[in-house]
């Protein structure tokens, strides 16, 4: 399990991430997640990266440390389809995969969406909501609320 976890972390930082603006742009940033529908709410602090494949498509790998006893991390990779509502505002639906150990290790899907608000030429405020239906029968499917900042370069 440690080798798989280490490989996933290396892949996360090797691939990095996407920006909501133009093809080839990168963005990285901190994020705080709140995992609901887990019995007790679980808070997570982490990092994400974004890479714009085109003006409308980007990928976003993320790594989140879960701050709850008996939990450790959440690894996710999502694809976003960007709708540029205004020069400073964009919204996106998202779909992807996740693996985490809220109670026990399990893998699942990410289904949701979010928005980016351009604060400066390099910084965005980002927020999202996603449902994580897991591929096991034992635990509930978390709903994740996230808030973060993205530095674009």
Task: State what each model feature region is.
Residues 1-25:
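Cleavable N-terminal export/targeting peptides
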Residues 77, 94-97, 109-115, 129-131:
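Hydrophobic alpha-helical segments of small multi-pass membrane proteins
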Residues 50-52, 80-84, 116-118, 150-152:
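Structural signature of outer-membrane beta-barrel channels/translocons
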Residues 20-59, 63-65, 97, 146-153:
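Short glycine/proline- and aromatic-enriched beta-strand/turn motifs that initiate or cap beta-hairpins
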Residues 24-26, 41-45, 69-75, 89, ...:
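Residues that define the transmembrane beta-barrel architecture of outer-membrane proteins
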Residues 26, 55-61, 87-91, 117-125:
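Repeated loop/turn-to-beta-strand initiation elements of outer-membrane beta-barrel proteins
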Residues 59, 117-153:
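Predominantly the C-terminal beta-signal and adjacent terminal strand-loop region
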Residues 32-38, 63-69, 73, 81-83, ...:
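Transmembrane beta-strands of outer-membrane beta-barrel pores
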